[in-house]
């Protein structure tokens, strides 16, 4: 594996981000940087110095349109859209856009016949019910969706969740039954439409972030801010969103937490993943 050059990885991610944002603009799809990318745009006018990737939010309606339009209109020779379905489990809960001319093999995706290029994560935003009872059920369905869509045990979310998940996956072993449960859960958790809701939530970001809810008005539109050598979209209500999700986001974390979060078995920024089938098959 080539030595990881963080800046080169950032620039590859930026190139992908530019293409993705341009595609969304051309097809009237709303997208915005989220998480570390949004923080980086405001605090550093670019990447957080130790960060290496970009993630985007999209309202659910635009997210589903993206999945339909990509293979029809995008440069799929260069960039693949990967979305789990009945015949493909990629152990993610959301769409990823992959650069086919690179290789970035992640431990949890070894053995999968997918594009193993570096990825942009595209995360949907869904309506959040106002009632506590309905919200609890939405979160329950969100957890069921997370388990049966990703079909991996939650490593970072406590022993009880892991034990329950292991039991459920051992009971429901059939691919068809798992897919049926996953689609039922997805339908139940997404039944609250963004346009009809006062708040929105991120149900595909794992147990911690799915508990967050944000004012819909924060995401009704985007604004463009400086990001490296370009402009990138962030939510119009970025301050409310980032404070709710991360607290005092403009303050640097302690030095010991300023670390890249590489989780890769193999990385090559100059050669496509098809050159390394023996490593990921």
Language-model features, listed with the residues they occupy:
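Active-site nucleotide-donor binding segment shared across nucleotidyl transfer reactions
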Residues: 21-54, 58-64, 217, 244-245
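A short secondary-structure junction signal
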Residues: 132-137
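Conserved catalytic core of two-metal-ion nucleotidyltransferases
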Residues: 1-27, 70-130, 150-246, 252-281
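Conserved SAM-binding loop
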Residues: 66-68
């Amino acid at each position: 594996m080539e030595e990881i050059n963080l800046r080169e990885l950032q620039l590859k991610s930026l190139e992908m981000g530019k293409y993705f944002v341009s595609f969304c603009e051309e097809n009237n799809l709303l997208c915005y940087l989220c998480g570390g990318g949004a923080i980086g745009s405001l605090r550093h006018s670019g990447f957080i110095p130790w960060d290496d990737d970009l993630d985007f939010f999209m309202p659910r309606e635009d997210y589903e349109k993206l999945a339909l339009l990509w293979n029809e209109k995008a440069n799929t020779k260069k960039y693949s859209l990967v979305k789990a379905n009945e015949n493909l489990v990629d152990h993610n809960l959301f769409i990823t856009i992959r650069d086919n001319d690179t290789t970035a093999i992640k431990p949890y995706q070894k053995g999968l016949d997918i594009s193993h290029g570096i990825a942009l994560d595209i995360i949907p935003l869904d309506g959040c019910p106002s009632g506590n009872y309905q919200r609890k059920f939405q979160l329950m369905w969100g957890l069921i969706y997370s388990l049966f869509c990703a079909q991996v045990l939650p490593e970072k979310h406590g022993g009880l969740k892991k034990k329950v998940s292991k039991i459920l996956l051992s009971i429901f072993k059939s691919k068809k039954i798992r897919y049926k449960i996953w689609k039922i859960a997805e339908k139940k958790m997404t039944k609250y439409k963004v346009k009809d809701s006062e708040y929105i939530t991120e149900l595909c970001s794992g147990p911690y972030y799915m508990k967050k809810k944000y004012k819909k008005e924060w995401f009704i539109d985007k604004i463009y801010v400086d990001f490296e050598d370009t402009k990138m979209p962030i939510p119009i209500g970025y301050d409310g969103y980032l404070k709710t999700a991360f607290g005092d986001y403009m303050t640097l974390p302690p030095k010991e937490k300023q670390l890249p979060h590489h989780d890769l078995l193999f990385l090559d920024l100059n050669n496509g993943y098809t050159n390394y089938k023996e490593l990921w098959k």
